[in-house]
Amino acid sequence: MTSQPDLPTFSSENLSDSVQRPGAEASAPGRLDVMGGIADYSGSLVLQMPLREATTVRAAFCENPELRVFSADVGETFTLPLTDFQTDSYERLRKTILARPGGDWAGYVVGCLAVLVREKALPLRAIHFSVKSEVPLGKGVSSSAALEVATLRALCRLYDLDLPGTELPRLAQRAENGVVGSPCGLMDQLASCFGKRHHLLPIVCQPDSLRPPLPLPNGLHFVGLDSGIRHAVSGASYGQVRAGAFMGYT
């Protein structure tokens, strides 16, 4: 895994015939942790680099009264009737999503739509999503953040909505915390959203103070090696460590 070149695009052939073209497409990269890593939730300074590997999401309004999320990587389609979609309780929505096949991965996409509709008072409409990702799953390179940022970017283009400053990564974090149920910090979403090719992104995680990107000297490269250890922010141990860090402030 190396630093990020141009982001990919992919065809929309897997979107259903009922979609109202044109749709919106957006991409976001994974990130390589160069310094700081898991200490983001304790307010530390971290250095992150965007990867070449990215996630691309295409979204389009459709006529069928449902949300549909197709993953080109697993070859599955998640569907949720609009009548079962509610934003008054993220926890209730999480249970509804997980009760359906594919809900474990589709929750990131549906969660982004939920927070955007709720926080920005947008009209809920039937949408079909198509997702393709090159970011390795469970390897600690922020595959979930890349999916969230790409989804929110696509939705903002679809709804013709502009989110200033760090609002987009904050909404992405809210989707992962509230709908997915993972107690992640904000670092991954910031890195995926604001990372610059061939640069390190310094972030002071208190919670989202961005410093100017640092260009890499010529000839210097960072390479990520797969340790074979699977990583999951949703794991119980992560939540326990984060809770312990907060207790240290009191």
For the regions a protein language model found, what residue spans apply to each?
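Acidic-enriched catalytic cores of C-N bond-cleaving enzymes acting on peptides and small amides
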Residues: 183-187, 191-250
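ATP-binding N-lobe of GHMP and related small-molecule kinases
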Residues: 2-145, 149, 153-166, 170-180, ...
